[in-house]
Amino acid sequence: MKPAKLVTLNAITDTKVVLIVRLPTAEQSYDVARRAIEGGVRAVEITLTTPGAMGVVERLATEHPEIHIGAGTVLDAHAAYTSISAGARFLVSPQVNTEMIRLANRYQVPTVVGAMTPTEIVTAAEAGADLVKVFPTEAMGRAAVKSVLAPLAHIPLVPAGGATPDNVHEWLAAGVAAIGVGSYITKADDVAANARHFLDVIARAS
């Protein structure tokens, strides 16, 4: 049996998709996540900026033990511990917080840590991040990510923001480990259909 940490990391890098759910209410977050799961999404990040987000993490983790439910915007070790206690199977942070990463590693929970510059990316990797979230991608761009990966190909990057079926092939061609997708799925009229389409495009482009 593979360790749970490796199972989660494999789920992210095999499907190459992390759904980022950042919505105004807990009920919206739960409903969108549930419909995205119906569409085939296997890794779902519920951001802690949503009031009641921890309850959503716990509910989804309980109802969908086969899905990798993560907590996003985890800024410190306390939030990390609370998220893990609620059932989060991976943690996402917009910045490098060594105490948070250390606690996650103690409990063998994968971390996706935010960075933008090459120095920040290396710092995140040296701190023990399993994946490095390139953020904000709108400011950096796909060409820049490809340039960064040239000397840092050994560090698995996950760009977040602005992903659509029209541009994912460019990200994958740049060599990223996975892609964080948000509004294309979370704000769709038919969440499950958009999730299926996005995953299909990713699978064909991989």
Q: Where are the regions that the model predicts?
A:
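Conserved beta-strand positions in the central sheet of alpha/beta enzyme cores
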Residues: I20, E45, G70, V92, ...
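Conserved functional loop/turn residues at catalytic and ligand-binding sites
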Residues: G40, G87, Q95, Q108, ...
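Short acidic, glycine/proline-enriched helix-loop-strand junctions
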Residues: T62-I67, Q108-T111, I155, A160
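Glycine/Thr-rich beta-alpha phosphate-binding loop at enzyme active sites
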Residues: V41-I46, I84-R89, N105-Y107, T117-V145, ...
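Catalytic cores of alpha/beta
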Residues: D76-A86, T119-A127, A144, A150, ...
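Conserved N-terminal beta1-alpha1 strand-loop-helix module at the mouth
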Residues: M1-R89, R106, P165-D166, I185-S206
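Glycine-rich phosphate-binding active-site loops on the catalytic face of alpha/beta enzymes
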Residues: F90-L103, V134-R142, A174-H197
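Glycine-rich beta-to-alpha transition loops that act as phosphate-gripper elements at the mouths
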Residues: R22-P24, T50, A71-A77, S93-V96, ...
